[in-house]
């Protein structure tokens, strides 16, 4: 996908809270992706970008009651809607960066969202290598093996695997 010949990897925190409400946000840097980015930069000549798809700059405070009520309905509806604005944002980010590799961190609560992000990457360019790691793939590796949108599942700490 990258015509300039420079290898590029896009590391993604998939959306989760933003699926409950368009102004909810994960207002922290995805530290695990930061460690991966640092390791990749230190040991390779690849360009690396970290994208937190769960971050909304003008967010509001989360209400727990919303997460389990109307927000949960919204969450499920957005997972089923490929034209939702969050998926357009993910698509645009991948299209603009033009990565050779997309790495997606996944916890069990955001695994469906991570799978959608992986499918979007494959729809853009089937040659993009899609890797997933994090708690969910480490514990539930069979979920990764049963999904064609992932090329590689990383079990445990990913720093050494990503450099390889």
Give residue spans per PLM region:
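Short glycine-rich His-centered loop
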Residues: 6-28
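Glycine-rich beta-alpha loop elements in corrinoid/cobalamin-binding modules
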Residues: 32, 39-40, 47, 51-57, ...
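Generic signal for short, ordered secondary-structure residues
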Residues: 18-19, 72-73, 100
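Short, flexible/disordered intra-domain loops and linkers
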Residues: 20-26, 62-66, 78
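N-terminal beta-loop-helix "entrance" segment that forms/cooperates
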Residues: 57-73
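A broad, low-specificity signal for short, low-complexity segments enriched in glycine/proline
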Residues: 9-12, 62-67, 112-116
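Basic/polar N-terminal segments that are highly enriched at the extreme N-terminus
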Residues: 1-4
């Amino acid at each position: 996908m990258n015509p300039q010949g420079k290898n590029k990897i896009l590391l993604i925190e998939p959306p989760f809270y933003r699926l409950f409400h368009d102004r909810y946000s994960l207002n922290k840097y995805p530290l695990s992706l930061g460690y991966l980015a640092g390791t990749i930069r230190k040991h390779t000549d690849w360009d690396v970008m970290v994208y937190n798809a769960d971050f909304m700059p003008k967010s509001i405070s989360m209400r727990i009651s919303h997460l389990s009520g109307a927000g949960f309905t919204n969450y499920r509806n957005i997972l089923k809607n490929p034209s939702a604005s969050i998926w357009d944002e993910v698509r645009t980010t991948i299209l603009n960066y033009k990565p050779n590799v997309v790495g997606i961190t996944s916890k069990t609560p955001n695994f469906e969202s991570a799978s959608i992000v992986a499918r979007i990457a494959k729809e853009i360019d089937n040659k993009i290598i899609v890797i997933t790691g994090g708690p969910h793939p480490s514990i539930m590796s069979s979920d990764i093996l049963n999904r064609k949108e992932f090329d590689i599942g990383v079990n445990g700490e990913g720093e050494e695997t990503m450099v390889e």
